[in-house]
Amino acid sequence: MGQSKKLNKQPNSLSPLVQLAGIRKCFDGKEVIPQLDLTINNGEFLTLLGPSGCGKTTVLRLIAGLETVDSGRIMLDNEDITHVPAENRYVNTVFQSYALFPHMTVFENVAFGLRMQKTPAAEITPRVMEALRMVQLETFAQRKPHQLSGGQQQRVAIARAVVNKPRLLLLDESLSALDYKLRKQMQNELKALQRKLGITFVFVTHDQEEALTMSDRIVVMRDGRIEQDGTPREIYEEPKNLFVAGFIGEINMFNATVIERLDEQRVRANVEGRECNIYVNFAVEPGQKLHVLLRPEDLRVEEINDDNHAEGLIGYVRERNYKGMTLESVVELENGKMVMVSEFFNEDDPDFDHSLDQKMAINWVESWEVVLADEEHK
């Protein structure tokens, strides 16, 4: 989350495929998308991420042509498609329910779109079989949907969506109906398929782990607005505000007060009663309130016994949760704040398996913290 962990950013040479400009949408007089601008690049896997009701599915439906905008423009490959019917947009959508035809075979489900487009009969079989090979279902062509597993149905829906070679594939929470293990498997398969096809994917989800795993770029939304737009690493390690920080994974938020600025990067501050140096990349004044954000895995803990003294935030272990590779501890600071700490499991460390009520000192590597201004005390 800090300077010492940043990777070099790769230059973005992708060209725009979809451009949303000044998009506004209301339902029953209620504004759900007040003013949205978004560019989606050729060949990228972009995820719209946010809580229920944030507007992400509405944006997807506007791109697909399943809803009409109240104002603004939608461009696809430099062509204005704002008022173009959905069937003429060269955009396909995979819904959460998959929407397979139960009376048709897998082959006929995949071929349906080609027949609707009046594709020459001689082309249909090779194109359908090519699509089924891409999703490793060529031997299932004559089965009915009820004879397939959930993951196989998912792949049929994707094959049907890509068989007519759309410019853009939209996926609306299309993994959420799968069990955990199958969902993890499909995340990898979907990303590999996207790379193989070279088609631009726009994926909608409220699952943060899913977004971090699959995406080239994540757009975090709240109340119809974009809160942050960046790579998974940027979103996780450099959240721009408290909403993004709290929505993406676990995070600890410490209250801090500025004492003085030391140099261009560092500020001396009181953090939950402890004086320390923090990295602040914006102007601050003595006495100003700040938030210091640290992920559980970025914290370091040390047991304190009666005969030793340790620097750091002092607290006591209140809960321990064994997670296989990690041990998660909840530490209560002396001021009552609860802090989550995650440590990689090390059975050779005699002090690793902390006892309940064990006194602890919490520290972190300087510059790994993210510091945000306190909006309420500006």
UniProtKB/Swiss-Prot annotation:
Gene3D superfamilies: 2.40.50.100, P-loop containing nucleotide triphosphate hydrolases. It is a peripheral membrane protein. ATP binds at residues 50-57. It catalyses: ATP + H2O + polyamine-[polyamine-binding protein]Side 1 = ADP + phosphate + polyamineSide 2 + [polyamine-binding protein]Side 1. GO terms for cellular component: ATP-binding cassette (ABC) transporter complex. It comes from the Bacteria. The gene is potA. The keyword Nucleus does not apply. Keywords: ATP-binding, Cell inner membrane, Cell membrane, Membrane, Nucleotide-binding, Translocase, Transport. InterPro entries: AAA+_ATPase, ABC_SmlMolc_Importer, ABC_transporter-like_ATP-bd, ABC_transporter-like_CS, Mo/tungstate-bd_C_term_dom, P-loop_NTPase, PotA-like, PotA_ATP-bd. The complex is composed of two ATP-binding proteins (PotA), two transmembrane proteins (PotB and PotC) and a solute-binding protein (PotD). Belongs to the ABC transporter superfamily. Spermidine/putrescine importer (TC 3.A.1.11.1) family. Residues 18-248 form the ABC transporter domain. CDD domains: ABC_PotA_N (cd03300). Part of the ABC transporter complex PotABCD involved in spermidine/putrescine import. Responsible for energy coupling to the transport system. This is Spermidine/putrescine import ATP-binding protein PotA. Its EC number is 7.6.2.11. The lineage of its organism: Bacteria, Pseudomonadati, Pseudomonadota, Gammaproteobacteria, Enterobacterales. One of its GO terms (molecular function) is ABC-type putrescine transporter activity. It is found in: Cell inner membrane. PROSITE patterns: ABC_TRANSPORTER_1, ABC_TRANSPORTER_2, POTA.
